[in-house]
C-alpha cells in the first residue's frame, strides 16, 4: 500500500526531507556495523509480563532472531503488504517481531497490551489483519487464548511467544524461503510501514497508516533534539504502539545504534533502578512524573542518576519552573515534545531555545519570516485558524486551531475509520489543538488547550465518545458524559458524570464496561451524580463546566 501522491514525494525528496531510508535498511546497517554491541535489553520485570527469561541481545543476535521470525511469518502465509497485528509488552520479542514484519515488507499494526476483546475485534476487522502475534501469557491473562476466541468475520492466524504447541521462541522455518522472498522483494519508502490507532472524539478508533518517508521525517527531529548517538543508553518507558515509542525511541535506535533498554508497564521504582543499573543517558517521562520527583527529591536519594544528561517530555504542558529545576538541580536538560500519530512533530530543544522556561512554554513557529529552524521544521508550515469564523490568525495573543503541513504529516486515515477528512482545503492537517503566536517577533507557538475532548491518562488517549456510547446502554443511566480530571502521576484520570434512572455506583459501571471487553486503562475511576447534564442552547454538553466542577 503506497501512501503519498507523486507530487508530495517530489516536493519532499527534492528538498532532502524524505530519503530512501527504510526500517530494514537501517537495521541491517547496524547489524553489519556493530554486530557485537548490545542492541536491546529486556525489562527487569519481564517474567511478570510474559513467559521467557529477560534477555540482552547484540545486534548480530537480534538480526538472527528477526530473520528466524521473518521466515516463520512467510511460512505462515504472510506476504508483502499483508497486515500483521502485534500485541506484546515492551520487550526483546516486540522489537524482533516488528523488525521481522518489516523485513518481509508486511505492515505492522501495533496494539496496546491493554486492548481487550472489544478493541481487538475492531482493529482486526478494520485493518484486515492476517496474522496476530502476541504472547501466550500477558501478565495474568491468557492473551493468546482470548484472541483465538474472538468472534470476527475473518479470524487471523494467531502466533504466540510461549505457545506450548509452537513457541515462537524456538520455532524455525526454512531460511531458503526467506532468501528467495528477499531476492524478489522491492521495498519503497512510500510503502505503508505501520497502522497505529488513535482515539479521537468519534466512538471508533481511527487507523493511522504511516510509511517510511513520514516516519523517518519524525525521527530526524527526535534524534537531533537530544543529540542521540551510538554511545547512548536509552530507557524506553513508552509502549511501542504510537508516536512516542516508535518515533521517539525505536526509529532513533535504528538510526544511531544506541543501546535500548525496555520498560513496561510503568513502575517508578523499576524505572529508577534501570537508570541506575544500566547507566542510562537519555529517557522519556511525562511531565507529571518529573514534577513529582522535583517536589520530592528524597525519592531520588538512593538512586544514582548521574549518567542521565537529558530527558524528553511532553503530551501535556510543561511547568516552566520544573524544566528550570531539572536543569539547575541535576544538570539535566528537559526537551519539550508535542506530537501526534498523524504527524504533529513540534519540539523545543536546548540548542534552539536555551532558556529552560522559554523551552517549557514555546515551540518554534515554522515559516515565520526571518526564522531559521532546524530539521523538518524548515520544510513545514503552519497556520492558526479561528474555529468559529475560519479566519487565519496572524497576530500574537489570539488562540486558534493549529493547521499543519510538512514532511512529518501522514497521508490520511485508514478507510472506514474516520468520519471526516482530516485536511483543510489547502491540504493542511487540522490538528484539533489550540495554540497562540507568542514570543519576540512572533517567533514561537504557545500551546493553549485541546480542542478535542480527549483524555490522556498516562500517555494513553481515551475517547470519551466510546465510553459514553457503551454506558448509554446501562439500565440505570439516563445520560452520561465522560471527562478527565487532574492526577499528579498519570496526568488525567477518567470520571463518569451520570444522570441516573435508578441507583447506580462506580463498581456497577466498571463491571458493565468490563463485560463489554473494554481496556482497563479506560475504566472510570470516579463517579459524579447529577440531575441533568449541562448543555448549551443547541443541546451540546458543556464538558468544560463539568471539568471545572471536578
Range-by-range predicted roles:
Residues 17-19, 36-91, 95-99, 116-121, ...:
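Conserved AMP-binding/adenylate-forming core of the ANL superfamily
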Residues 115-122, 132-134, 283, 406, ...:
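AMP-binding/adenylate-forming catalytic core of the ANL superfamily
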Residues 216-233, 241-282, 290, 296-297:
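Conserved AMP-binding/adenylation subdomain of ANL enzymes
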Residues 75-76, 106-170, 501-504:
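Structural core segment of the AMP-binding/adenylate-forming
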Residues 372-381, 389-422, 462, 504:
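Conserved ATP/PPi-binding loop(s) of AMP-dependent carboxylate-activating enzymes
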Residues 5, 44-55, 138-189, 199:
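ANL superfamily adenylate-forming
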Residues 280-285, 298-367, 381:
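Gly/Ser/Thr-rich phosphate-binding loop
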Residues 20, 35-38, 159-163, 175-197, ...:
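Conserved pre-ATP/AMP-binding loop-to-beta segment of ANL
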Amino acid at each position: 500500500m503506497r501512501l503519498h501522491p507523486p507530487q508530495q514525494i517530489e516536493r519532499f525528496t527534492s528538498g532532502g526531507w524524505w530519503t530512501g531510508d527504510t526500517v530494514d535498511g537501517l537495521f541491517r546497517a547496524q547489524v553489519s556495523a556493530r554486530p557485537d554491541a548490545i542492541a536491546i535489553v529486556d525489562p527487569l520485570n519481564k517474567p511478570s509480563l510474559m513467559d521467557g527469561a529477560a534477555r540482552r541481545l547484540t545486534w548480530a543476535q537480534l538480526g538472527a532472531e528477526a530473520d528466524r521470525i521473518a521466515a516463520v511469518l512467510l511460512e505462515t502465509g504472510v506476504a508483502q503488504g499483508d497486515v500483521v497485528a502485534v500485541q506484546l509488552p515492551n520487550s526483546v520479542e516486540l522489537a524482533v517481531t516488528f523488525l521481522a514484519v518489516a523485513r518481509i515488507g508486511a505492515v505492522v499494526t501495533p496494539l496496546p497490551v491493554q486492548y481487550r476483546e472489544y478493541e481487538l475485534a475492531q482493529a482486526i476487522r478494520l485493518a484486515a489483519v492476517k496474522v496476530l502475534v502476541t504472547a501466550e501469557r500477558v501478565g495474568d491473562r491468557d492473551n493468546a487464548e482470548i484472541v483465538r476466541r474472538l468472534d470476527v468475520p475473518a479470524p487471523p492466524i494467531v502466533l504466540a511467544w510461549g505457545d506450548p504447541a509452537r513457541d515462537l521462541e524456538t520455532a524455525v522455518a526454512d531460511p531458503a524461503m526467506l532468501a528467495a522472498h528477499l531476492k524478489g522483494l522491492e521495498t519503497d519508502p512510500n510503502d505503508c510501514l505501520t497502522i497505529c490507532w488513535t482515539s479521537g472524539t468519534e466512538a471508533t478508533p481511527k487507523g493511522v497508516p504511516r510509511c517510511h518517508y513520514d516516519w523517518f521525517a519524525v525521527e530526524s527531529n527526535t534524534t537531533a533534539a537530544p543529540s542521540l548517538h551510538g554511545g547512548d543508553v536509552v530507557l524506553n518507558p513508552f509502549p511501542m504502539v504510537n508516536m512516542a515509542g516508535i518515533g521517539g525511541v525505536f526509529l532513533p535506535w535504528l538510526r544511531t545504534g544506541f543501546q535500548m533498554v525496555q520498560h513496561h508497564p510503568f513502575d517508578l521504582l523499576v524505572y529508577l533502578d534501570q537508570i541506575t543499573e544500566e547507566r542510562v543517558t537519555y529517557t522519556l517521562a511525562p511531565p507529571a512524573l518529573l514534577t513529582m520527583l522535583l517536589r520530592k527529591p528524597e525519592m531520588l536519594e538512593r538512586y544514582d542518576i548521574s549518567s542521565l544528561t537529558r530527558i524528553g517530555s511532553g503530551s501535556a504542558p510543561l511547568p516552566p519552573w520544573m524544566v528550570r529545576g531539572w536543569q539547575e538541580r541535576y544538570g539535566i536538560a528537559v526537551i519539550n515534545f508535542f506530537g501526534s500519530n498523524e504527524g504533529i512533530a513540534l519540539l523545543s530543544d536546548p540548542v534552539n531555545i536555551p532558556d529552560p522556561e522559554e523551552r517549557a512554554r514555546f515551540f518554534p513557529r515554522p515559516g515565520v519570516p526571518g526564522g531559521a529552524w532546524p530539521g523538518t521544521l524548515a520544510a513545514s508550515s503552519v497556520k492558526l485558524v479561528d474555529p468559529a469564523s475560519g479566519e487565519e490568525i496572524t497576530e500574537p495573543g489570539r488562540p486558534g486551531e493549529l493547521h499543519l503541513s510538512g514532511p512529518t504529516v501522514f497521508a490520511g486515515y485508514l478507510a472506514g475509520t474516520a468520519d471526516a477528512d482530516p485536511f483543510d482545503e489547502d491540504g493542511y492537517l487540522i490538528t484539533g489543538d489550540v495554540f497562540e503566536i507568542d514570543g519576540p517577533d512572533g517567533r514561537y507557538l504557545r500551546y493553549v488547550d485541546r480542542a478535542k475532548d480527549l483524555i490522556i491518562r498516562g500517555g494513553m488517549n481515551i475517547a470519551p465518545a466510546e465510553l459514553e456510547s457503551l454506558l448509554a446502554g446501562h439500565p440505570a443511566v439516563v445520560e452520561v458524559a465522560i471527562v478527565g480530571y487532574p492526577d499528579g502521576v498519570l496526568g488525567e484520570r477518567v470520571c463518569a458524570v451520570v444522570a441516573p434512572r435508578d441507583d447506580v455506583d462506580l463498581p456497577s459501571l466498571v463491571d458493565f464496561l468490563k463485560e463489554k471487553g473494554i481496556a482497563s486503562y479506560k475504566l472510570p475511576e470516579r463517579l459524579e451524580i447529577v440531575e441533568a447534564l449541562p448543555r448549551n442552547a443547541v443541546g451540546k454538553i458543556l464538558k468544560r463546566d463539568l471539568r471545572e466542577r471536578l
